[in-house]
Each structure stands twice: as structure tokens, then as C-alpha cells.
Amino acid sequence: MTVKVQISGTLKEYSRQSSEINISALNVGAALEALQSEYPSLYNCVCDETGRVRRHLNLFVNCDLVPIQNTNGFDTLLHSGDVLTIWQAVSGG
């Protein structure tokens, strides 16, 4: 099933300047695997060397936060037309 991945901010430079990517995936883990094969530089910005999502990023499916602190979040199901958003946390002083 096809889902839309929305890329925020500076991560666009790793997605060939696209703010949206269409991929085929059944769950969040499969979506990340698709990113790894199609956009390896983007994947490396999103996930660390162990495959976990980096701490300064959040993933949302249709505006619902994905619990990526544990690997169960990778099992979050995706349906055709869903939107997976990769959101980069911003902070300052």
C-alpha cells in the first residue's frame, strides 16, 4: 500500500529536495526500510547505526505520535493514503 512520507526542514536535502515521498509499506518499520534502500542518506539522518530512530526526531502517522522509543512503534500499521511525517525537534535558548 502506498503511503506519503512528509519530510520536514533541513532533512529535505537528503530526499533530493522533496518534502513528500510516496512509498509502499505495511508498517512504520517497513517504511523505514524503504527509505534505507531508496534514500540511504535520509535514512542515516533518521536512524542510527542500530536502526533506532534518532532521539531528536519524532514520527507521526496521520498526526498521531509513533512510540519510537521502543521497537513496538515500528509495528504501527500503515494504510493506503496514510501520511508518515518525520519531524525534526527544534530547541533553542
Q: Would you name each region that the model predicts?
A:
Residues 1-92:
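Ubiquitin-like/PB1-type beta-grasp interaction modules and other compact soluble beta-rich domains
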